[in-house]
Amino acid sequence: MPSVLENILKDKLLEVAVLKKNHALPINIAPSDRDFKKALLEKKTSFILEYKKASPSKGLIRKDFDLLEITKTYEKFASCVSVLADSKYFLGSYENIKIVSQHSTKPILCKDFIIDAFQIKLARVMGSNAVLLMLSVLDDKNYLELFNLAKSLNMSVLTEVSNQQEIERLLKLQYDIIGINNRDLHTLKTDIFHTLELRPLLPKDAIIISESGIYSHAQIKALAPCVNGFLVGSSLMKEKDLKKACIKLILGENKVCGLTRIKDAKAVYKNHFIYGGLIFEKSSPRYIKPKEALKITKAVKKLDFVGVFVKDKIKKIAKIAKKLDLKAVQLYGYSQKEIAQLKKSLPKTCAIWQVVSVADSKDLAPKTKEASLILYDTKGDKMGGNGVSFDWEILENAKTPFMLAGGLNLDNIQKALKIKALGLDFNSGLEISPGIKNKDKIKQLARILREY
């Protein structure tokens, strides 16, 4: 039985014939005017974000495939973008490259199974600045011909390898940027550790992109030290809220707690934090009345709000969660039985964060089945936050996912980022005074979170 790749290549011959029939190329093709390679090197870790409507492994991924709306989001987060041009298996087109090039400022990769010089010329005419060449598809002679054609048009080339044999071939040829595909193109299975296996076989100074199977910030942080960037498509395209998906993937699921002002909540959202925390414990200096909290949640609807409760009645928690449309409740001092009871009363859209207060490793506790994650905070006199940190090294073997809280600030953020937390929970470290956030510190923190 032919593999998926073999079927694609068989159909690609027919597709290229149709492209040649439908598109007349100009005699002189303008060279690329956007530097794809340079854009990849502007940050320690770069992101090629992809426009992908469908794929052979997943079928239709994004029904509402609005190129302009996708572009608006990718402009904020992408180093470069990738546009699928394959029509049969990915529902892409070369016309999509033209549309994206007219509305995006980012260098564009033409993503296709390129077997013919016509595809590269057409991609350039449509506005592409780089092409993908796959050693699983091309022999050495054809690869070099296509590589040299692309370079003559001032285009970058992303050469894809997927195994040791292809790397051995590549090292005898020319290359520009190297992509390690984590997907087996014959079975369509993915394994992100494929990048870790193949990276040592490539030159240390090579520009390396990890492709396929990237779904989480944890995967990004695990692979980032050994590559220059990532090509990501399916994991973003499947999400309705594309901006939030980009933030979670690139920055993680971070939170600023103790919000008491609308303008602080707006600053938190603007700087790409996922969560804003509202403290409903009256003994806290950051306590906020539910009616005041409602004003904030209504004013900044796209920020996911988390309510912090300390030994409050279940009925009261459920009422506030519904009224404010909380995305999670953060619980201090509740038994497993109480958490189970609360789960029944909460809206389905509201998760439970089980707080575990920590002084030493003996305090680490398993998550109850009703909770979506554990939040580790410092054990102290006050439940609901003490503004001091604990020895984070004891979390080295903690089960994920978990959030980390307790005395986080700009001075210890680098150490905190080494902990494998789903996200970090900031509060007093970003304040002018209790409940009053410092927008400059929020901005500075956002920059640090992206510096990897």
From Swiss-Prot:
Pathway: Amino-acid biosynthesis; L-tryptophan biosynthesis; L-tryptophan from chorismate: step 3/5; Amino-acid biosynthesis; L-tryptophan biosynthesis; L-tryptophan from chorismate: step 4/5. Residues 254-448 are annotated as: N-(5'-phosphoribosyl)anthranilate isomerase. InterPro entries: Aldolase_TIM, Indole-3-glycerol_P_synth, Indole-3-glycerol_P_synth_dom, Indole-3-GlycerolPSynthase_CS, PRAI_dom, RibuloseP-bd_barrel. One of its GO terms (biological process) is L-tryptophan biosynthetic process. Transmembrane segments: none annotated. Its EC number is 4.1.1.48, 5.3.1.24. Coiled coil: none annotated. Gene3D superfamilies: Aldolase class I (3.20.20.70). One of its GO terms (molecular function) is indole-3-glycerol-phosphate synthase activity. Keywords: Amino-acid biosynthesis, Aromatic amino acid biosynthesis, Decarboxylase, Isomerase, Lyase, Multifunctional enzyme, Tryptophan biosynthesis. The keyword Membrane does not apply. In the N-terminal section; belongs to the TrpC family. In the C-terminal section; belongs to the TrpF family. This is Tryptophan biosynthesis protein TrpCF. It comes from Helicobacter pylori (strain J99 / ATCC 700824) (Campylobacter pylori J99).
